Every structure is written in structure tokens, then in C-alpha cells.
Amino acid sequence: MGQTQTHNAIACFVPSSNNGIKGTVKFHQNGKCEIKLQGLVPNHTHAIHIHEFGDLTGGCKTCGGHYNPEGVTHGSLKHPSHPRHVGDLCNNIVASSKGVVAEIHYFPDVIVNDILGRSVVIHKLTDDLGMQGIYEGKKFKSYSEMSLSELKAYAINRNYFKRGDKINRETIVNKLNTESLKTGNAGSRMGCAVVGLSKK
């Protein structure tokens, strides 16, 4: 019998008519993850996750939700006392003034064989880490503490509602709190790539 070969995994982003993102996200057997991307929005924080499917027949829309084998709520490694999806990864990546990201992270719960055939998705906006609110500098502000005008702008920017919709404060807060524990309110999907075996 031949010797079993240990492989790493890689997701390769190729520019398309919809976005100019290119580069790789590489997953190693020891949990190391190398993110090397360009073509992102300069000086912007983008959410990044592993999604459950590698189905790109409908673009990034058919990649499913976050990879979540344990069936828990969305969270972050920054808050270890809270549950998190395995696919939440580092939640966010920060692009330089040239739209470039070069980051290294460690995700001990990401098993290479379990993510093959799934996808890495980059989102337009920032992941709120499942905290049901946002940070303004170092100060945390829950969605229930935001003004109605802030809430409307935040929700419309995430395509939850349209301008002119008659929505009250409670409806918006409930939607944002629900999505915070599901998607991190990360906004639309701007780029995706299937995770496959890496040659190296």
C-alpha cells in the first residue's frame, strides 16, 4: 500500500467582472492560515469566513451559510467564552492603503479534510463578532443603544431594508441582533473561492 500523503488546502481568488480580488487563502494541517489578497477596498475592514458549500453556480450566493458543524451561534476567537462557528475564522481582515492583505492566523479547530470542497467568502462590510453591536473606537455600543437614524443607515447598508420602507426601531434592532448571531451583519458577498487541495 502507498503511503498516505498529507496535504494542505487552498482557496484561489481570481478577478471577475464583479470584483478585482485575487490571491490565496491557504490552510495548513497544523492550523496555520496564510491570507494573501489584493484588490480589496483600501483601508477597509472586510469580513471573511468559510461557507458550507463550494457551489458557485449562482456566484457567491450559492455558497450557503457559515461552515458550522457544531450548530452553534456566530462568534469570534476574540471572545472565547462565547460560541463560534468553525467557519468564522478571524472574522475580519484589514486591507492596506493599496487594498492588500497579508495576514497569518492559527485556527486549531479548522481541519483541512473537513473544509475541502467548501468555500472562502469575503464580504463587503465588517463582521460584528456576534456581539450584537459595534465598537466606536474602544467604546462598545449595542444596537439597542443606537439612534433610529443610525439603525436605519446600518440596516439599509446591509440590504435588510430599502430606503422609504416604514420600519420601526424594534424591528430593526431585532433584525440586527438576529443576524449578529448568524452572519455577523457582514454585508453582501463580494468575492468567493472554492477550497481545494494544495500542491504544497
Regions found by a protein language model. Name each.
Residues 1-200:
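N-terminal leader/targeting pre-sequences
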